[in-house]
Amino acid sequence: ITIIDNSFSSIGRAVMWGRSLYQNIQRFLLFQLTVNVAACFIVLIGAFMGTESPLTVTQMLWVNLIMDTFAALALASLPPSAMVMKEKPRSREANIITKPMMWQIFGVGIFFVLLMFGLVQYFKHADVTSLADFSFAEYFKNYFNFKASQGISALEQTYIFTIFVFLQFWNLFNAKAFHSEGSAFKGLFRKDVIAGFGLALFVIVAGQLLIVSFGGEMFNVAAMSAKDWMYIVLGTLPVFIIGEAMRMVKKL
């Protein structure tokens, strides 16, 4: 290590930046692997059931852009935190994917899979033209209904696709808060965070809006009403709320 200003404070800053970068990489892996677990299992279940894939190839391409490009932009741009200096030194043999990360990856990923599987089953056996008509009773009734179905319409496919994207959108906040021991809102409105994390969030929402509105046959989607957008945003919000609640409990 080179002391550039004849002071050991430069070494401290270098360690802080190094630890913060390591945590940002962990956050990115946490988010990316959670999406991978969910997307892979959803597609595999559709294949084993002999039905059309819940997510089309072009839709998966957009999900991959969110997972790789925008998530990397959002999480890699998070500024260093002095809190990392309070942590114990890490062993060279330590795995970058820790046990808490593994639990969160598979726990959240499998939850997303179970939720999306239920939605696919529901839309296969119900003729849905608006999410205002969504019935939890029918959702659970059709969960294990493997009888011949009427298939999934373009609008219902759009619901599945958009719900999946917004599940990842809110989970991106949980990935940001990983290791921070605080709210995902902490430092969210700093200029450097807005320039990276905020921009990525905007691109995800704006991109999804444009795809649903103008994607048509290319993405196998249909335009949704403003109410449907509201239901999806609010319906997927508990992913973030539960994450915030769990972080608050850990602080107690």
Residue ranges and their predicted role:
Residues 103-116, 163-167, 194-212, 235-237:
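Hydrophobic membrane-spanning alpha-helices of multi-pass integral membrane proteins
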Residues 126, 177, 245-252:
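Membrane-interface capping segments at transmembrane-helix boundaries
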Residues 97, 101, 181-203:
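C-terminal membrane-solvent junction of multi-pass transporters and transport-like membrane proteins
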Residues 144-151, 186-187, 213-227:
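Aromatic-capped, Gly/Pro-kinked transmembrane alpha-helices
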Residues 168-172, 240-247:
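Alpha-helical transmembrane segments
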Residues 225-239:
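Small-residue-rich transmembrane alpha-helices that serve as helix-helix interface/gating elements
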Residues 1-182:
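Membrane-embedded transport module
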Residues 44-53, 121, 208-225:
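Transmembrane helix-loop junctions at the membrane interface of multipass transporters and ion channels
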